[in-house]
Amino acid sequence: MKSTAGRGVCGASQWSAARETARRASKLDEEGLEVVVCRHGMLLRALNMYRGEIFAYPLYLQKELQAATNGQFYCTDIACKYWPYIEKLAVSMLDLRPLLQMRPFLSVMHAKAHSTKCEIIWSGKNQEGAGTTAGEEVEMVNSYLSRCALTTKYMTKSARNDMLTVHAIGWNRQKKKCLHLALSSRYIKTFKKAEAESQRLEDLSSELGCPENIVHQWVHDVRQWATDGTRCDDDQSNLQKSIEQMFLGVHQKKASLYNQTDSNKIRHLRRRRLWEEKRKLFDTIKLYNEQVPDEERIVEEKVVSGLSVAGGDREAESVIWPWEVHSSESSNILTKKKIFDAYMSKVRHEEEKIIVMREMRQHCTYLKRMADNIRTVISEISSGRNSGCLNEEGHRGLLCLLQKRLADVEEKFQVVCSSYRQALGPNASSLLEDGPEEMLEDHEEVDYESSDDSDFEGV
């Protein structure tokens, strides 16, 4: 399969992970670790990287998990580049076509560094059925495993693998132990936030003069604007790309000025370089403004506001350039995007309530089935049907272990159900019902797939 030339650039930022090939490091055998986690932070798979971050690693992990689970979403920080790569491979490799059934999901925080249109199309907060999954859970695992780096770099390969495995097992054990607390807390927070987001959408609609029957039309208009990729002529297009790249470069360097430096000497050098790039950016903006009509010019004050890191204005998070706006919508696309963001936030929180309730039910059902299976094994051993070659003493010891395990599972089941009932309140009556309809309550308009579906993230 011939690799696609070019860099992994999206809206001006260059992503080192968005590439198909990479050179081996001359002084390193293993360059890092790539992991996959579920939306609850449990580590599912991991592999050693030998050639930096390339598409082949998440492809392998996704293929392994797709065969073992029924994942609905896969999340990466370069989903907009990774999805075309899978589509290209699926044309010639039939065994990879099932991967196209999973939906791409751009992690919410990483989406802020992508272009505005890319964020609207790919970000998890705009994906139907994703709930409020952030897609950044893998960063917690990376932070935890990074503690091993001080010691594992002096170990042999086998000892290093054992050390990382022990830490991964400990991480998953702790996550599994506290799962009922995490789900209960998540449901309570989501329930409160859903009411707040619904009220925020109503207030914003009243403020902007957008009645309820127009909200869906504005949401559709924003999606259509994001999928429209028309550009100007070649000369202006080159200037536009340069402005986007320089703007995001200055913004990111300014944001990381104190995070990635620990001495005034280095900060002084970076400030000087930052000032030069900022001057070059505004020179390019002036050159662009000389070539376009007055209504299509870039307002330098908005660019300065967008470069402000300390500002809390949401409009500063993403600048919408004049060439990104349809000529007929130049006055109201920003207004429509405010409604779009508020509407998506409301819908995602409503979805999250259903998802968490379904996960609570799955957790209780899992513990109940485990207890039933242990009782079945105890019954078979007690009746002598499954005693094997054990002597009488071993037979009694095995029964004691199984009874101890059964007592632990039953106690865990009671604790979990009590926690969920306290969090759900009146909705707890359907927690262990056979039919999933009771859990949907008044949210019949939300259509979900099988309860076996899961979301996982690979970075």
Q: What do the PLM-derived regions correspond to, one by one?
A:
Residues 1-459:
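Catalytic-core elements of nucleic-acid end-processing and repair enzymes
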